[in-house]
């Protein structure tokens, strides 16, 4: 079987066993490394400036949104999984031999540079400082994308772009998903600078799948699992059979 695990499940196991920890008189738990990963995506077709998904302005728009989302990943994953999951910066599980390592030349934290290519974060930043730095970097990306920015606020969108976008997530309609807190916190942060990110919690998983498989979704949350010998080109090349995983 492939059971779902979270801090809530761990608490339930402890309650059933009557003791703290993974093992007890009723349930014995063994956690194993897993090649699966979850991700948050934006559709280039639906989130762009002026109908040109590949323009620099369109890329800057998507980077603005994702820079803020990425800043809240650690908090969201920690609250859901504790130390049983880690944040990844490339679309492959850290349990795979093919995953980039932090010691590799050129390794970067996802969405950690500003519009000028400078590092957003420093090693001594506290969480609140990190969130503030991400918002400041996002403003730079929004402005580069053609948004009107004044006094730390976004006041108008360029032609062919919007002040609000939506991300669909299958959190059972009640927020039960490891990425839900990440998104809601990012949405709250973006709201403070005048931009609306709507988090659409879809109770029916089939509706979520249909929203991105049909190409209708602006953004979505899903998951994938790499094979023993992963072919990332096949999976992510834009001219392949599908690149939404």
Where are these regions (language model features)?
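Periplasmic binding protein-like
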Residues: 1, 189-245
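A structural "hinge/loop" feature
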Residues: 41, 50-54
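Solvent-exposed loop/turn segments at secondary-structure junctions
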Residues: 3-6, 36-37, 46-48, 71-75, ...
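Extracellular/periplasmic solute-recognition and catalytic clefts
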Residues: 1-46, 78-79
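Append "and occasionally in soluble cytosolic enzymes with long acidic Gly/Pro-rich linkers
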Residues: 56-188, 196
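Extracellular/periplasmic catalytic domains that process cell-envelope and extracellular macromolecules
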Residues: 21-22, 33-35, 158-161, 212-215
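Short secondary-structure boundary/capping segments
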Residues: 13-15, 82-84, 234-240
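Structural recognition of the beta-strand scaffold that forms the well-ordered cores
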Residues: 29-31, 38-43, 67, 76, ...
